[in-house]
């Protein structure tokens, strides 16, 4: 599995201009105003996490995936590497952009509003992992290009359904915000982490099964 990580790290090195551009955009957003800190962290976290999906596209190019399967690498190890890569990129992206936000805003501003905003952005990590939980099995089964489009359609449907339910129930953004603020943050965080771990592991199991049935 180490070889798979080395391969994907080399792929990321080839895309270093892309990552530098994303980081620069994050710095600009952080400097734009206090309200942009959370957006910058969320943007960088999701964009970086998606690269785990992009590596599958590179693997499939010119029958590269079929060649990889002739090496001493099992299909389960291949899928495991993608899920570990996705989780690692997500955590690293959040950490890098959070540090960038602190540097851009100044350490002094950590007392109060900025620290609360950065802590609040921790929610982007499970959200990015849930996005990968849906997308990775689809990409593994249908291929990078088709799987990416299907995942986009699925997320659009999910968002539309949630939005419709909120409107049907007559809930306002303020009401939802007030309800969330009334919850125990520690319990909510623990619940979100547990739910994300269960879904991510379940997605990994599905991904392995799909990969084992895949023909090259």
Model-assigned labels for residue ranges:
Residues 1-63, 81-216:
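Hydrophobic alpha-helical transmembrane segments of membrane proteins
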Residues 77-79:
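Alpha-helix N-cap/helix-start motif at helix boundaries, enriched for small hydrophobics
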């Amino acid at each position: 599995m180490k070889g798979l990580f080395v391969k994907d790290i080399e792929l990321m090195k080839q895309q270093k201009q892309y990552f530098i551009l994303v980081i620069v955009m994050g710095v600009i957003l952080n400097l734009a105003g206090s309200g942009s800190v959370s957006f910058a962290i969320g943007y960088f976290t999701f964009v970086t996490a998606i690269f785990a999906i992009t590596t599958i596209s590179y693997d499939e190019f010119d029958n590269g995936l079929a060649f990889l399967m002739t090496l001493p690498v099992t299909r389960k190890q291949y899928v495991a590497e993608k899920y570990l890569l996705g989780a690692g990129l997500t955590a690293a992206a959040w950490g890098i952009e959070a540090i960038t936000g602190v540097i851009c805003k100044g350490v002094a501003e950590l007392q109060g509003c900025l620290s609360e905003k950065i802590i609040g952005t921790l929610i982007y990590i499970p959200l990015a992992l849930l996005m990968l939980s849906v997308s990775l099995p689809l990409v593994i089964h249908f291929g990078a290009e088709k799987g990416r489009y299907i995942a986009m359609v699925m997320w659009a449907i999910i968002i539309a359904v949630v939005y419709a339910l909120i409107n049907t129930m007559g809930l306002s953004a303020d009401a939802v915000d007030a309800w969330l603020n009334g919850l125990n943050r520690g319990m909510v965080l623990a619940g979100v982490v547990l739910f994300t771990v269960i879904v991510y592991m379940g997605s990994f199991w599905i991904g392995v099964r799909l990969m084992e049935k895949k023909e090259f």
